[in-house]
């Protein structure tokens, strides 16, 4: 999937590099290429996370390893790490270095050596430390790269240059960004699973149909977007509900205004108000109304910075592009930014703008600092969100399996399992007859993959899958003799319920496996001429409960497969599950709080939790004065 400013190109859309129609959104082509642009145009291309290495390998083979290399980034010396590294050079023990870092002002740690260390600390700040690999940058050279730079082999087997992206641009090399993301993996695998499970083929590029689909629009408007690319976080779902977003244009804007700068500057709140009250606000200046009418006078995209700087403040397009890069965190010169800042205010003063208006416009520009999207980038993300939403709306079980298998979502696996259960799936523990390495769906039954079982070795999984291809397992003895899995691994499989095909309970299976393997000296396979039948013993009746299963699952999966409500000693009455008509009343929470996100402040903490209900889920954000109690 092509994204970023390259999606401004109608040629890219025509070649199926992107699914973004630039004419539909009146995208600003000059953001991609213009005569005044100070850097080469950049085209970001995303692949599924599990395909990027294959694509990179193809590029090296296609153009030759002498002509291709990954770009480097410079990791620099920073802060306390300088003291630590220089202290090692001077032979100081770790304990003394720690004291020097934590208590630099203490006189007992001040001597000629420490004075030299602190002097070097100031001098080395920002110096290169070591090379790292750029997130996805690749350069291709017509002549062998070793004519221009040394190459260094990385553990993945691909060489890197001794340049970063800025040096490569200065020399004249164009960078190709081969990036990856897991959202594409969700979509790609969903399409495959849907075809396999229910026989429906989907053309995922029919984005125009997805944008106008009433079911998808309702899903978007309600914020039911768990698992969907870029729109599943609590903040994003909350924004969608506030905007009552149900169309492409609104989602494109929402994808950009959710970024930290706009939210912290208060402009996100202002945008929501203006979105719902288009006749109840005033534009800060007539020029701003002309430039930003589509976004109600709020700068939302990087293009807005360019347009406002050029048309409002009279900054030429070359400097406007430098300003845009600076706001994106890509500027290399503080002096350049200071010069453009002075130019902005001087030009505004010459044009007779009130100082308050000039400062407010600049404040909005500064909100883009470090993290901002071009409109084309937001549009690319919105298209992928619509693709995810379509799959979740009409094929929720298969979609959630794909989300679970690709990992890397906003929530833990447990949350996605609960979401699948709420959409009608039967969640089943791993099974040696039905489960694969990854999670699998058969009809409405979802069998968790062996990959989720802690301490289960890959060679054990491979042995199970290999033998199962030959024929099903007859019983416990047949399973043990064919897979050759040792006792500790068998105990894990029993506790997670993977050997339930035997018809025996977990405790009985544990007895059986210890009788078969517990005290047996392992005989080399080549020396065992005849298969000796094991002796059978009568065992007492052994029982286990749902609570036993839940505890085993907590230990091996990290979460129980049943609903926590099923484990209650006294079952809650059905009507008590509903919250209707119970506003302003206290409620008890039945949920273990596992993930706590605390942002420490002087006066409070933020407690962010995910709460599960029987047929729903709730994100909770609390301001609490219990900084030291959690």
What is the predicted function of each stretch?
Residues 1-630:
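Noncatalytic, beta-rich nucleic-acid-contacting surfaces in large DNA/RNA-processing enzymes
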């Amino acid at each position: 999937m092509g994204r970023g400013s390259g999606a401004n190109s109608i040629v890219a859309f025509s070649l199926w590099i992107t699914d973004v129609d630039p004419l539909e959104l009146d995208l600003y082509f000059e953001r991609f290429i213009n005569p005044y642009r100070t850097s080469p145009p950049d085209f970001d291309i995303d692949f599924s996370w599990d395909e990027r290495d294959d694509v990179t390998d193809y590029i090296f083979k296609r153009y030759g390893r002498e002509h291709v290399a990954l770009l480097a980034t410079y990791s620099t010396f920073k802060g306390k790490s300088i003291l630590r590294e220089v202290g090692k050079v001077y032979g100081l023990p770790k304990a003394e270095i720690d004291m020097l870092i934590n208590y630099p002002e203490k006189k007992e740690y001040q001597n000629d050596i420490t004075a030299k260390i602190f002097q070097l600390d100031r001098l080395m700040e920002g110096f290169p430390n070591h090379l790292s690999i750029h997130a996805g940058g690749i350069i291709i050279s017509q002549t062998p790269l070793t004519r221009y730079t040394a190459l260094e082999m990385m553990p993945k087997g691909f060489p890197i240059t001794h340049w970063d992206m800025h040096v490569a641009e200065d020399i004249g090399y164009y960078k190709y960004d081969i990036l990856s993301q897991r959202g594409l993996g969700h979509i790609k695998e969903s399409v495959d699973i849907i075809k396999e499970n229910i026989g429906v083929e989907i053309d995922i590029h029919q984005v125009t149909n997805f944008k106008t689909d009433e079911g998808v629009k309702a899903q978007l408007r309600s914020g039911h977007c768990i698992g969907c690319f870029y729109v599943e976080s609590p903040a994003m779902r909350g924004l969608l509900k506030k905007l009552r977003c149900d169309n492409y244009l609104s989602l494109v804007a929402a994808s950009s205004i959710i970024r930290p700068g706009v939210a912290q500057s208060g402009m996100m709140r202002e945008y929501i108000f203006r979105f719902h009250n288009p006749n109840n606000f005033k534009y800060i200046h007539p020029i701003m109304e002309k430039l930003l009418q589509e976004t109600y006078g709020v700068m939302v995209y990087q293009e807005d910075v360019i347009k406002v700087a050029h048309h409002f403040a009279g900054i030429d397009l070359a400097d406007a592009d430098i300003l845009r890069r600076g706001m994106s965190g890509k500027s290399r010169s503080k002096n350049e930014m200071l010069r453009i800042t002075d130019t902005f205010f001087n030009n505004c003063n010459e044009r007779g703008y009130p100082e308050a208006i000039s400062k407010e416009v600049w404040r909005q520009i500064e909100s883009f600092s470090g993290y901002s999207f071009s409109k084309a980038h937001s549009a690319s993300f919105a298209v992928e969100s619509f693709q995810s939403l379509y799959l979740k709306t009409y094929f929720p079980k298969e979609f959630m399996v794909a989300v679970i298998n690709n990992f890397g979502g906003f929530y833990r696996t447990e949350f996605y399992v609960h979401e699948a259960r709420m959409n009608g799936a039967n969640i089943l523990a791993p099974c040696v007859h039905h489960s694969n390495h990854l999670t699998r769906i058969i009809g409405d039954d979802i069998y968790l993959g062996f990959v989720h079982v802690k301490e289960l070795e890959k060679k054990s999984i491979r042995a199970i899958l290999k033998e199962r291809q030959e024929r099903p397992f007859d019983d416990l003895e047949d399973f043990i003799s064919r897979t050759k899995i040792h006792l500790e691994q068998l105990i894990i499989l029993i506790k997670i319920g993977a050997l339930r095909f035997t018809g025996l309970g977990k405790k009985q299976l544990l007895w059986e496996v210890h009788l078969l393997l517990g005290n047996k000296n392992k005989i080399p396979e080549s020396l065992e001429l005849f298969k000796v039948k094991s002796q059978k013993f009568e065992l007492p009746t052994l029982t286990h409960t749902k609570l036993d299963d839940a505890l085993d699952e907590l230990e091996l999966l990290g979460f129980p497969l049943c609903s926590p409500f099923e484990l209650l000693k006294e079952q809650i009455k059905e009507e008590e599950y509903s919250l209707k008509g119970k506003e302003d009343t206290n409620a008890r929470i039945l949920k273990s709080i596992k993930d706590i996100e605390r942002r420490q402040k002087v006066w409070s903490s933020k407690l962010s939790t995910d709460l599960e209900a029987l047929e729903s889920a709730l994100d909770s954000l609390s301001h609490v004065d219990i900084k030291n109690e959690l």
